[in-house]
């Protein structure tokens, strides 16, 4: 989280439990990511949080690094991989056209963004009216993001490289998987850890 108070008061207890039951385990920290740029909390020109997507990442990265320093722990740099995918994308994600999205009728959904790795659409049933309402998720990883995150974890936890990854889900093209693997590999290789595995 970009808000340190969301976990500063809770992670010490979690670490205490882990160290009690698994004293020899390495504690690592999963770094999350900033929301999609069309989330109203970070959307320009007037985000409700008062800052944009890049500033959200800067703040959450600072909080994760502070926690990692306190624990002498490594960070799984998923959020950094998300940032790299945004920087390297052939075009900038600008969000979905609301008029286009409104034409969809349950159970059909708009296609996933071929650019952004965060966000998707789903239907939920309104408990009062019983009607299906489309909801846009602008903060969880979509299928592309989940694949990239899996690549980050695999390379981070097992010391592997992108060349070791051969699985490509049917929903992702080989070209896109190469792009996502490349972002994941760069993140794992280049993220400046506060602790080295050899320490």
Per-region residue spans from a language model:
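Alpha-helical cap/lid subdomain in secreted, periplasmic
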Residues: 1-143, 164
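A cross-kingdom marker for long, charged
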Residues: 167-199
């Amino acid at each position: 989280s970009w808000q340190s108070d969301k976990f500063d008061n809770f992670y010490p207890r979690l670490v205490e439990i882990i160290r009690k039951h698994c004293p020899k385990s390495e504690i690592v920290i999963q770094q999350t990511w900033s929301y999609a740029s069309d989330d109203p909390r970070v959307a320009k020109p007037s985000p409700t949080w008062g800052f944009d997507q890049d500033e959200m990442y800067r703040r959450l990265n600072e909080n994760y690094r502070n926690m990692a320093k306190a624990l002498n722990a490594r960070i799984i740099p998923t959020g950094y991989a998300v940032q790299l995918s945004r920087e390297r994308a052939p075009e900038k994600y600008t969000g979905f056209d609301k008029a286009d999205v409104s034409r969809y009728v349950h159970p059909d959904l708009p296609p996933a963004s071929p650019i952004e790795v965060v966000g998707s659409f789903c239907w939920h049933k309104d408990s009062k009216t019983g009607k299906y309402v489309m909801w846009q998720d602008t903060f969880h990883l979509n299928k592309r993001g989940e694949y990239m995150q899996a690549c980050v974890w695999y390379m981070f936890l097992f010391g592997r490289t992108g060349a070791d990854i051969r699985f490509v889900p049917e929903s992702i093209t080989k070209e896109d998987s190469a792009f996502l693997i490349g972002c994941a590999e760069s993140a794992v290789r280049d993220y400046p850890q506060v602790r080295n595995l050899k320490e």
